[in-house]
Swiss-Prot record:
It catalyses: L-arginyl-[protein] + S-adenosyl-L-methionine = N(omega)-methyl-L-arginyl-[protein] + S-adenosyl-L-homocysteine + H(+); L-arginyl-[protein] + 2 S-adenosyl-L-methionine = N(omega),N(omega)-dimethyl-L-arginyl-[protein] + 2 S-adenosyl-L-homocysteine + 2 H(+). The keyword Hydrolase does not apply. This is Ribosomal protein arginine N-methyltransferase rmt3. GO terms for biological process: chromatin remodeling; methylation; regulation of DNA-templated transcription; ribosome biogenesis. It is found in: Cytoplasm, Cytosol. Belongs to the class I-like SAM-binding methyltransferase superfamily. Protein arginine N-methyltransferase family. Keywords: Cytoplasm, Metal-binding, Methyltransferase, S-adenosyl-L-methionine, Transferase, Zinc, Zinc-finger.
Length: 543
């Protein structure tokens, strides 16, 4: 009997049918063919007749790695994710169907950003919920039968005489086909549901005339799903070592404590806390990167200490009432860009114990005046001559946007001043939108070309611990021109009008931060200033 793999049925059908009725008819016809050709070769609609050395792609249960051999996949899971399929199967005495459920259970948990609980397998595998394939055409499921048959042959030490070996082969094949049939029926039901949802959505869209609200959150979380952004952040030694040193130098406040990591990303801060002795770390993220964070925890033997939860901090619940410490790297350009501080403050109000600690404990926005003739003017002067053409109209956008770049310390022409402080234990979401006064004294004569701002970050081990005015490595880190450059760089507000100022001239004014009305993750900045009795102002958008 020539048996064509079930995964191929599904592939062929999806090329030929376009409606749910077509799917149902295709299933009926295909299994009718199978039943009427029990001992002969089947005509597969002129598809390939011979299925020799077919190459399968086996996807890892925990990460994006793929393999062409199932045994290689299990070896990878054991080495990279501390999951021994053969040991789990043997210890729990799992049969063919239970192994199917095990694979689907693990895939479903990883997809939801959760850590699979293998200690409760007996209860979990009683449900038929995990007979439904998580991945379409999951080669692991379709090859488990061969895997288990192979195990049986390896373990069988008795020679048994079989009158008709073909009958045993057919029985095994029938068993496998029944399972594959059940899987396909489950997949068909999912397709049916998806199709109905699609039709319902289309109908709703046709009836509705109300413009859809921009989904800025989805775009935001998707932007943190890839490796590049995390490479940039982790490679920032000032940032990463600042957090690491705070945790490792203060292991006494983490030992035996419960920690919440808001926006865990790759899980680096959670792993720092676990290594420092935290009893439990709850790592929350709403981006696909959480799947890699789970893999990272498994790989480093920290999966028992860290529980990953996928979702918005505003929506999720924790297995515990309160936590002892909340840690988060939430800072954006100009500190509040992307508005992640809002989520951290929500987490504090929902989950932090009254005596709990926020890490970092305080952040400060800092402003200075900048003088230069080259670096800061480059994005403006570029448009004066573009391959022989004038494009001066393009200059306007450069004055409306915030230029994020590394500013040399030599361009700083006034003693920096703090214009906003955020005590993370007490501040409120509404405090993030503000207007603050500032006063700068010019150090050397020259044109006032721009205002430049950055932020400083402070860590404390107690809620009431005094915070020094000066920033140093012992208490935190700076993102200013005087320090080692970071991926945050500095934010430059270029001025249209550039008055020439003498040494000692005072520049006074106000600076305002507010959320952009079109996208609340973008940042609007307005500056009003007065020099020698002459007032001026300018507004910017950081997006």
């Amino acid at each position: 009997m020539l048996v064509k793999p079930m995964a191929c049925y599904f592939e062929i059908w999806t090329r030929k049918v376009t409606t749910i009725e077509d799917f149902s008819l295709a299933i009926a016809n295909r299994f009718k063919q199978m039943g009427s050709h029990s001992d002969s070769e089947v005509d597969w609609d002129n598809e390939e007749e011979v299925w020799e050395d077919e190459v399968h792609e086996f996807c890892c249960l925990f990460c994006d790695s793929t393999f062409t051999c199932l045994k290689d996949l299990w070896s990878h899971c054991k080495e990279a994710h501390n999951f021994d399929f053969y040991q789990v199967k043997q210890q729990n005495n799992l049969d063919f169907y239970a192994c199917i459920k095990l694979v689907n259970y693990i895939r479903s948990q990883v997809k939801e950003g959760k850590t699979p609980d293998l200690d409760k397998l007996s209860d979990i595998l009683r449900s038929d919920e995990y007979m439904i394939s998580v991945l379409p055409d999951d080669s692991v499921l379709f090859s488990l039968g061969d895997e288990l048959d192979s195990d049986f042959e390896d373990d069988n030490t008795l020679e048994i005489e079989v009158e008709n070996p073909a009958d045993v082969s057919k029985d095994a094949e029938i068993k496998k086909l029944k399972l594959q049939n059940q899987l396909l029926i489950s997949q068909l039901e999912e397709i049916r549901k998806d199709k109905m949802n699609e039709l319902t959505s289309q109908t709703t869209d046709q009836l509705s005339v109300t413009p859809k609200k921009a989904d800025n959150d989805s775009y935001y979380f998707e932007s943190y799903a890839g490796n590049d952004i995390h490479f940039l952040m982790l490679n920032d030694s000032v940032r990463t070592e600042g957090y690491r040193d705070f945790v490792y130098h203060n292991k006494h406040i983490f030992a035996g404590k419960t920690v919440l990591d808001v926006g865990c990303g790759t899980g680096i801060l959670s792993m720092f806390c676990a290594k420092a002795g935290a009893k439990k770390v709850y790592a929350v993220d709403n981006s696909d990167i959480i799947q890699m964070a789970i893999s990272n925890a498994f790989e480093n033997g920290l999966a028992d200490q860290i529980t990953f939860i996928r979702g918005k901090i505003e929506d999720i619940s924790l297995p515990v009432g309160k936590v002892d410490i909340i840690i988060s790297e939430w800072m954006g350009y100009a500190l509040t860009f992307e508005s992640m501080i809002d989520s951290v403050l929500v987490a504090r109000d929902r989950f932090l114990a009254p005596s709990g600690i926020m890490a970092p404990s305080e952040t400060r926005l800092v402003l200075t005046a900048t003088t230069n003739t080259e670096l800061l003017e480059e994005p403006i002067d570029f448009w004066s001559d573009v391959y022989g053409f004038k494009m001066n109209g393009m200059k306007d956008a450069s004055y409306k946007g915030v230029s994020v770049q590394v500013v040399p310390q030599t361009y700083v022409n006034a003693k920096p001043v703090v214009f906003a402080r955020f005590n993370m234990h007490t501040c409120k979401v509404q405090d993030v939108s503000f207007t603050s006064p500032f006063s700068l004294i010019i150090d050397n004569e020259g044109p006032l070309c721009a205002f430049t701002l950055w932020f400083d970050t402070y860590f404390t081990t107690k809620r009431t611990q005094p915070i020094p005015e000066a920033i140093d490595e012992a208490c935190g880190f700076t993102t200013g021109p005087q320090g080692t450059p970071t991926h945050w760089k500095q934010c430059v507000l270029l001025l249209r009008n550039r008055p020439f100022l003498q040494k000692g001239t005072r520049v006074e004014g106000t600076i305002s931060f507010s959320k952009n009305k079109k996208n609340n993750r973008d940042l609007d900045i307005s500056v009003h200033w007065n020099v020698n009795g002459k007032a001026d102002s300018q507004s910017y958008v950081l997006n």
